[in-house]
Amino acid sequence: KPVTFFLHTPWPKLVPNDVIAIKILEFLATGMLAADVIEFQTQNDLQAFEEFALTHLTTQTTAGKLKVNPVSVEVQSLQNQMLNHEHSLELTESDISYVHVARTDPIKNTLVAIASFANVVRNSEPSQVRSYLDVYLVPSRQQWPSYQGLLTEIAECVNKYNDILSSLNYSPIRIHIGNDYHRASQALIRYDYLIACSVADGLNLVVKEGAILNNRNGVIISTESVGAMAELGKFCVVAADPTQVCVTQALLDANALDFESRRKMSAELKRHVQEFDSSNWAQNVVANFKVLEKV
């Protein structure tokens, strides 16, 4: 008998009110319940799926195994990048680097990331130290007008806040458009603050890549809506909500951390991602085969 899997599975944490959306979820859940193994990204995803199935599919049961096994990154490959990296980011050693890496997707909350950074810089004491936000965007779903409009809106937002901050005599927000993985990786090595403030995000591997690549005790600022925070939230600054007010406050909290706190958080991030890397994820997947062979 073939073994069937669902891997790296997200599930909505809130059940929509829309009847059609519920029907679609019922259709998906019915197929999933026929699988031998369903692996979810987080415990919250698993619990949300169980609650949905119990409520909406009361006559259907599953003999399959439900478990949490979040996908991860290939640590050795990332560490090799660190050995071969080149500094080409137009930053001096004293510059403070904020980084946001995302697809052009509304859920990534890029507009809030930009506005929150601008709030922090605008309300900071005058300083000789420059702060930059480098926004790395991979255009996504550009065949859809709403996504085309978002990219335009982000560019306009960058120009607006650079104008507001013109008294700094430099442009603190820089936008980089294109799928340039090498340059984005350089930014992850160099950041002081990595902003991943998604409204909803199944996992977000950028924060795991950043945790391994970074060499400056950089702080990750995120939200509870980012799936990776189920694993890493204890070692990050997590905004109460993905709103501009809350993300701004999270940035201020991150700025207030002392050197030792930053060092410990960075070390714990690296330790956790190294322990639960992509090979650990794959071993957990393969272990399912061994169990099912005995059934």
Where are these predicted regions, by residue range?
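Active-site proximal beta-strand in glycosyltransferases
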Residues: 1-13, 31, 37-40
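Histidine-centered beta-alpha loop that forms part of the nucleotide-sugar donor binding/catalytic region
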Residues: 7-10, 70-71, 225
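Membrane-proximal helix-turn-helix segments that form the acceptor-binding/catalytic region
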Residues: 22-38, 268
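A short, active-site helix/loop in glycosyltransferases that binds the activated sugar's phosphate group
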Residues: 33-68, 73-85
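Conserved catalytic-core segment of nucleotide-activated headgroup transferases in glycan assembly
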Residues: 67-180
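Catalytic binding pocket for nucleotide-activated donors in carbohydrate/polymer assembly enzymes
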Residues: 126-132, 189, 193-275, 284
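Short acidic alpha-helix that forms the nucleotide-activated donor recognition element
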Residues: 180-192
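C-terminal alpha-helical cap of glycosyltransferases
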Residues: 278-295
